[in-house]
């Protein structure tokens, strides 16, 4: 009798259901790289095609290995970029200033995750007298324009910068979301007390520890086929993770912001800010020294001070002798000179009705 227990697609071992996750839609936390793309690359290493089915799953141990593989390859990419920058930086053509296009290309020399540079022997072209500079410039352009890929491009994969295949040199912390320039700096940050103390929630799918339940709620997008730059509850998208969390407060409606003066609670930070501004206006009211009138905002207070200025500008009314200190007040005053249209009475309406 055959076993009905699920098995891992990577290691082939049978395990309990709770330790598995479907490979389809599974993404590496932080980089948004699909796990199935990593496995496709390993087809070339083992020289064998891997038949991924919709119900193919991987155990947590193997997923952790794949996550670590992604981290190691990104470290290799950063080191390779530093070496490439050093090689190009010390080989600038003498007597020629570097153009903006060349500088931009040199800054982009890097190898994204899961991509390997294939070393090929370059045959040095024969140079004619006086063509040294042109030949060196040509070799630089060839090197900078070369694409480093390990597989054929897939038309089904998104290519726009706003989609989650965007390649970036910054690495986000999976606990607090802060961005770092290298894996080494990120690991130092994670080991620091400030980051470790913020671990309060754990994903029950991949075991990832994050800052709190709100960050965990956003992290679940990765297991549901979305990115961490999209709202989990609506179709809105944002450019930064912190903006998504700020927007999702509308859906949570937890009223976690409380006024320390009156105890009123709010679900959005800007609502409490406006509320605190009203408290501040009441406690630190602006009083006119001339007439002792009280104002709640600086705008109305400054507007009132103009009425006491002897050299204040005046805006006279063309229909009467009155003048005003600002154009808006004059505009409101002009309405008194406009004829008021009286509403037509019911009797008049009946008199104008024509019967056919």
Swiss-Prot record:
InterPro entries: Znf_C2H2_sf, Znf_C2H2_type. The keyword Repeat applies. Its main location: nucleus. Keywords: Developmental protein, DNA-binding, Metal-binding, Nucleus, Repeat, Transcription, Transcription regulation, Zinc, Zinc-finger. The keyword Zinc-finger applies. GO terms for cellular component: nucleus; polytene chromosome interband. It is found in: Nucleus. Pfam families: zf-C2H2. A zinc finger (C2H2-type) spans 171-193, 201-223, 229-251, 257-279, 286-308, 315-337. SMART domains: ZnF_C2H2. One of its GO terms (molecular function) is zinc ion binding. GO terms for biological process: regulation of transcription by RNA polymerase II. Binds to the consensus DNA sequence 5'-YCAGAGATGCGCA-3'. PANTHER family: C2H2-TYPE DOMAIN-CONTAINING PROTEIN, KRAB AND ZINC FINGER DOMAIN-CONTAINING. Binds chromatin; requires N-terminal regions to form protein-protein contacts, in addition to DNA specific recognition by the zinc fingers. This is Serendipity locus protein beta. It comes from Drosophila melanogaster.
